Amino acid sequence: MKQLFAFPLTYQSRKHEKHVAQYAHDLIMRENRLIPMHDLNSAIQLSTDYAKALDQFDLSMYFRLAYAAPFLSRRALWIASSNEHIKDLDHHLASIRTCAVYIAEQDFKQATRSITKNVYFTDIAVHNMQFPFEFDNSYTTAYKNALQTLTTIMYSPAETVFLPLKCFPFCNILMRGYSRETSLCMSPNALFELNQTVYATDFLSMTAFDFQQAVFRSNYDLLKLCGDVESNPGPTTWSSLSVEAITLCAPIKIPSDDEVKSLLPTLFSSDKVYNIFKEYDIIDPSDSVQTMTLFNTLRSKGEAFSKLSEQFSLTDVLNTANRFKVSEKLVMSIAFGMNIVVIDHENNQAYLTRTCNTDQTLFLLISKEIGSDSVSVPFVGEDGDHLRYVSRVTLTSEISHALFPGEALKPVDGSTFFESPTLDVFYEMSYDYGIDELVQLLIPNKYDISMIRSKLDVPRTPWSRFDVLNRKNPTYPPRPQPYGMGPMNGEQAKEYAKASIRIFNTACPEHKIAIPVIYTDDEIVSSNKSSRYYYPTSHAGTSIINHKQCVTDNKQLAPLFGSTPKKLFSKYVSQTNGVFLLMRVYVRELDNDVFDSGVIYVTLHVGNDGIGTHIILTTSYLERIGQSMLVNHVYKIRRADGKYDFQFLEVEGLVSDDEKHRDMLQEICSENDDVIKALYQQINKTEREISRQIGNVLKEHDSVNGRAIMKRADFRLVMHETDEVRSKQISVSVHRFKVLQIPVFTHIVTVKSEIEYGIPLFVRDALIPRIKRRLTSTKQEQHLSSDEAYEINASYRTGCKAVMSLLVEGDLVRLPCGMITTVDNPILHKHSCTLGLHALTGSATGPKKLRIHSAFKCSKCHKVYNNNILAQRCVRAHLGI
């Protein structure tokens, strides 16, 4: 969990704060610092490196105390004092056996005298610490521990002071990298004043220590030198924020003891309730449970929680998913250290309980049908005993995003399912931008917790990280690329895509819109032109589409996504054994010739039932439809749990520079030939013959080069009843942040590929008027065919580079830039990596010459242009016309 906190720059010393924090950030973000501190050795090394960074500045004692104090918080003390972690310290002990510390002391006459103390660090219980450290992660506790250590050194009656070995990282920073002779530079009077601030109700009320306190708070979450380093580096507020590198979550207020007591009546229900906590004797309802007692009890009941992997005890037959009460789901989520999603198949609803700021999520499906890994769940209802089945399901990231837009949910791995982590509860003070004040945070396990409302009745925080980003650092997308200006460079495209995602993910209402399926142009003419319509690529589709309707839809989203370099929201997968499939849809607005392109997600689980569909739409101009036919996806086949599935090797959209030059197809060659053949043989022979006529879903394995290629495809859902094949419409209704209504399929579901390469006639016809208007303004030719009109768009040419050779296999083409498409793609020759290339290939309709040779050139100077208009202008310039 990475959190963003302000750096309060106060008083004259603020000039150091920015640079010191930058050094701390760079230190933690080094490659060798990405592993959290796990023993005393790493703590000592980390403190040494950090002390060297601080030595570059002329810092006061207050500064060094602020930066060193985190090493005396709970996590650091536990790591440094655990017997199993104190090992291999001979090389450290040899250098820290003794150290001369010079202390400046003033008497009542203001006379200064120096005292020399020899400090020893040892793991033997002979040290001079009179009181044990308090174990807490709050600012107050770490500050007390730091002052306690200083008091022991300064007020020890003997010249030799023995300190616990766990104090060494703190002293290492405080005493300038721990040279053998160091000056503590602090008078007893100053130490006394520091101790007084511990008990002050307002830490900032004392001017003398204002900045020291502020430094500690501002860097406490940045440093996290006390344990969970790699998950808490925090960004620097003075530089631009990276959406990819930071996740902001709202802090929460810890429930009081009274609030916890008020949960008990709901946590332990009436005698008819089959309660999970009562059943496994986790908590006695008769006990008076305080806040810390509740979580400490849960921590000690790991064995009881493991039994939940075998049985869930539910109540209330009328509402399956709600049998888990809000308080139960809250405690379960905290105890498991993960989010809980309950999919109620019986009532077509899904619920998300998010308490831990982690993407690890447990997906539970409750259904009447038994699955391969289902757990039978008995419960008591008003009309008798009932039996339901609870299954752990694994959803793809696309489907989980469709169920809960804006949420990052990652299914827990099967090997760690229901492994209850140790529940350690920590407290610390942190700054909340939402309320502009310090709040106390509750941190179970290694995660922070997001906001929990007082009634604990909401699935997520009411405001998102984008609200915080916009408040602290407003970011506006660059202007959409002007027509005819060529492609964006890599950095522009990256910033543009990030800004586009930020705007699109902003919370806004969603509407359920009924959209009739239109098959012919006659139906378009006779229909109501004010409506939205669904143009299927085959004769099977959905009649209801969930459309994201923003207030600025026409003014902002349309141009934004119409000029996005690559589509950002689409992934295509089909697993032919009926696990899941995705379908591409286009929705056209007749009045403004704008398409909404989207993906429909259909999830198939538990017998023959499908448990979820969803459509995500983004606005796109008509010319972008052809661009979507370029595939940047390559899939690898793997065997898992006795089944075959596909694994993404690269996703569509903007990728890193390293991934751009990665030949994904070479990785497929390393797969077992038998695995690829076995998967391909699962496709029904009849379906395979149909697929070969209209486009394959999976290209047949080639024993020569060992490659299997998956093509982009549109799919239709087909229901089988005996030998009859009929279409089945899908109905879906989604309410953002509320309950998802999930459709139920009652027939055997199979997948048929319905691929139409090339541009539909209605798309080309719609292009002609717009193209003609543009040409009229430039006094170019007035009459264009559909093909010619489609080819003049200058924005199609991409700035890709040839990194591999051209590969043609059947009607499939791997372009030199690594993308995969077919020979029928109308914008194939627009890729700059194809300039000057020629190839012949065979397709379903016979031999065909690739169109990639048809780049536009000036006939005089032979310079290549993005479109014919620019090429003709160059010719006229040579001729002086």
UniProtKB/Swiss-Prot annotation:
Source organism (scientific name): Lymantria dispar cypovirus 1 (isolate Rao)
Domain of life: Viruses
Name of the protein in question: Non-structural protein 1
